[in-house]
């Protein structure tokens, strides 16, 4: 079956872009941009959400070792609260693409919307499942964000960030109600926005 990206010339430098962390109640949104090396096939690339932790870590190392270029960027909690998650995500995508050591000929982005870029850009729904460069970007973003949440777990051990990665699970919501919110919680998100208790920054 023909896809919108099937006819992209093979000699073009294609950057795949994806994010991790749009939905959680805490932590940054992380984005990654990857230009794969067409001469080195990385087996097993897929949507990061469908891969095991071990497989993601393995592929992370293969991607950063064998790709032509990659960059990882972020929008912090403060930017998410100030801009909203949609705009903050687009900003983080811009940052990742601008940080690439090689300028791409075309940028393929997972989802429906594209940031403003000086390159030919295309949004592809389910691109993380169908476009290897986007799959690679999704893996880099997911692994990077999960590692970040482990650091938060050590800093705020009562919240279980290592387990739920900031998503609004029952355990996470219970911890928020019991202990209040931390500086890494998104104050513009429900139900965080409804709470008045804050844990002061140290």
From Swiss-Prot:
Cofactors (names): Mn(2+); Mg(2+)
Compartments reported by the entry: Cytoplasm
Keywords assigned by UniProt, alphabetized: Cytoplasm, Endonuclease, Hydrolase, Manganese, Metal-binding, Nuclease
Gene Ontology cellular-component annotations: cytoplasm; ribonuclease H2 complex
PANTHER family tied to this protein: RIBONUCLEASE H2 SUBUNIT A, RIBONUCLEASE HII
NCBIfam families: PRK00015.1-1, PRK00015.1-3, PRK00015.1-4
Name of the featured protein: Ribonuclease HII
